[in-house]
Amino acid sequence: MIKTLLTTLKQDKETFEVPKSVQDAIPIRRLWPDGIFQFGSKFSKTLRFSDINYAIASKEDKTAMFLDYSELLNALDAGSATKITINNKRVNRENFEREILLPRRDDTLDGYRAEYNAMLMGKVTDSSNSVAQERYITLSVHRKSVEEARTFFDRVVHDVTSRLNHLDSHSEELDAVERLRVLHDFYRAGEETEYRLDLRECMRRGHSFKDAVCPDSLEFKKDHFVMGNKYGRVLFLKEYASYIKDSMINELTGLNRNLMLSIDIIPVPTDEAVRELQNRLLGVETNVTNWQRRQNSNNNFSAIVPYDLEQQRKETREMLDDLTTRDQRMLFAVVTLVHLADSKKELDSDTEALQSIARKHLCQLAPLSWQQADGLVTALPLGLRRISALRTLTTEALAVLMPFKAQEIRHQGGVYYGQNVISRNLILANRKELLNGNGFVLGVSGSGKSFTAKRELAALALSTDDDIICIDPESEYRPIIEGLGGEVVNISATSPNHINAMDMEQGYGDGENPVVLKSEFLLSLCEQLMGSRQLSAKEKSIIDRCTAQCYHGYIRGGYQGSVPTLRDFHAELLRQPEPEARDVALAIELFTEGSLNTFAKPTNVDTSSRILCYDIRDLGKQLLPMGMLVVLDSVFNRIIRNRRLGRSTWVYIDEIYLLFQHEYSANFLFTLWKRVRKYGACCTGLTQNVDDLLQSHTARTMLANSEFLVMLNQASTDRAELARLLNISDNQLSYITNVDFGRGLIKCGSAIVPFMDHFPKNNLYRLMSTKPSEADAAA
């Protein structure tokens, strides 16, 4: 027998003690707050790791993921054991509803909240949303003391974490309270919200931590067990097919039940494995030689070597070749699965369903007879293995038991964005949790771009006290804004509503010189007003000088009195001696003294409403780019004011590509995009012209650095550009190719998830819809 296996079996050998209580059935002898458990001379540590998009990856990407996962298995320490566990946790319905449903506020919007909650509950009743999957890696090692074990775990955990990061899977170490929570949620399924454990308080009172996690009762039968009011059964993979598909583990864990599937792995040092295989091959060759000698003695000189001997020789040679030339390792593994049900009948039905999945893959999943207690301890992420049905596998053969399926987006306090196409789970994202909350919504006309923004806007309006501001160049947002009790401000050349382009709140520069930032804004504004040509160096200097002179008295007066206007700026230009100043003044005269001077007057608009929309559709082609820029600067002033009040702000900019057509306006937007994150604001840009957007280097940078993107149906040229920019695989691109309304991809942080959204056609839907017939009905 291989020395490593012999040593492992010897070390794992335990003295059997009949448990006298349910607490005794939990084999943890001692634990430390950092999450290390002790069982005899064995210590264990658990990491939780996130899922990755394996199921929807292209063939090339799957191969790359498979090889990266194989490298992780190859890197496992030969002096320790590893357990990979997939945990299906039934979501507590009451807790889940409390987390996602919008509470009543006894105001005029409660009717919409009721409709929104009904929509969410319609999605939640789908069985897939009642189970949440978690994945763990448990490392266990025999050491003389916890200090030695801790040193070992520090080294190995760092290596495992870095290799998981290479797979885009993020991991975290579980402390003792979190590890015990996993056990509590399994042993006391349905009572997840009742978990309360303070280790210091337990020690002070002299209580055992096992009291907080153990079930009320635990009775083991021949092929199942009864735990409290639940029935359970432990199965193990008894027979393996010669070829197993990489989807088998995902299919087994796809059952909508409380279950845990664990893969116990014992790595073997390569030198030992090679020596063992060489001895095995020598034994097979000896058997072949002896057989041929017997045939020769019977004068049978043409006899063919028996099939079984030939197969043994072939398989041994192949495995030896794998180890010596293909960087494979020999590993011992056993797969165990424990599942729970509410009744014996349901348990038997679930067992048959699991066995049917295994049979489909030409494998045999069998219940453990009279070993249910040992099997339960083995299947849980404790770090123990009491089942000896080990199978010799190479790295490749073990990597086929792939624990990855699809990424999920489920943030605490997240907003609903649709359902994951792969798992059918709700996508709940909290943009405030991301490195920056800014984002884009991209899609061709009719793909659901505006609807997506309005759905998020409505959810925020109904569930938070955050301020919401829209810049609407198409007059599409009026129904939803007014329906939610907001204010729509019409701005045009003939409108009585005016916004001063030179408004400046105290704190505009965020501790820096506010005139510098305002100068950049006026440079971008003048560039827009002067047409397609770029400003010369002289003109830039003149504009900067005039800006400082306009604001000198206002800032020295403590931001009191009349705010300068574009008329003041125009007059200041005329006072300059340079002829270039008069050229700039003449170029902007139409917008200061002429018929398009709506932004050259003092602000007379009340913008204090929590939900505000600037309707700029009637500005016309001449004023629209300038109008978007001025409104954006006004919004920035509002964001600064909200920051002082400790209030978050959400900004939606439709047809954002218009701002990227000129260098200075693009740079102003880029600066704003970076600054608002510090002020507790999130900006969202919407456009159907992705190709036009990406012509701007600034826009490409903003798009590539955005943590949140919603990509709906895309034109072919846009798909190619997005694929290059965001490294989207061909398989993922299929989710934004000729798809229906409300379908696409969501990029949230590092996760890219295919989604779909079927919103019921209620009153809230009619407020959000931009389809003419439905919009008319809402009106």
Model-predicted regions and their roles:
Residues 441:
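Hydrophobic anchor at the beta1->P-loop junction of P-loop NTPases
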Residues 726-778:
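Conserved P-loop NTPase
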Residues 485-489, 698-711:
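A short helix-turn-beta junction within AAA+ P-loop NTPase domains corresponding to the substrate/partner-engaging
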Residues 449:
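Conserved lysine of the Walker
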